[in-house]
């Protein structure tokens, strides 16, 4: 049974040429035009996936309320909240990367709960695999940001 997308997709932001040209112009970061985390593709994907999981989990059995249902909702929402925290900590690279790592871990945890939901028959294989691959893509985008945080970090202008 193949459940993974195979490769962590994701473009993690803008291309190298755009990063280079923005850096040469002396802008504060490659994301200077973005006002909030809600404008980030990875945040949008994570939020949409968490909402899909919330809707789907409404049909999970009552006996799973405190085990599977609460856990999958919590971890999927935590992906978004950790991205939001990372966004607000862009002045400090270590804190930014730490929060992105937390978000990545929550996405991986969500994938684990998805596997349980599929194996227990609460999710169809098709829907479960689609959601799993969505989180695989989210993880890929987060890994790209973690691997190259500099363009995302706010830098002070030297006058």
Language-model-detected regions and their locations in the chain:
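Amphipathic alpha-helical assembly/interaction segments
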Residues: 1-159
């Amino acid at each position: 049974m193949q459940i993974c997308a195979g490769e962590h997709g994701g473009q993690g932001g803008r291309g190298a040429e755009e990063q280079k040209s923005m850096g040469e112009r002396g802008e504060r970061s490659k994301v200077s035009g973005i006002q909030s985390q809600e404008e980030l593709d990875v945040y949008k994907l994570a939020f949409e996936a968490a909402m899909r999981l919330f809707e789907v989990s409404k049909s999970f059995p009552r006996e799973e309320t405190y085990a599977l249902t609460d856990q999958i909702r919590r971890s999927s929402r935590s992906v978004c909240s950790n991205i939001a925290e990372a966004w607000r900590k862009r002045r400090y690279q270590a804190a930014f990367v730490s929060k992105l790592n937390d978000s990545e871990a929550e996405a991986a945890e969500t994938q684990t709960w998805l596997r349980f939901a599929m194996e227990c028959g609460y999710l169809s294989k098709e829907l479960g695999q689609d959601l799993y691959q969505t989180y695989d893509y989210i993880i890929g985008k987060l890994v790209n940001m973690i691997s190259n945080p500099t363009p995302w970090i706010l830098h002070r202008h030297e006058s």
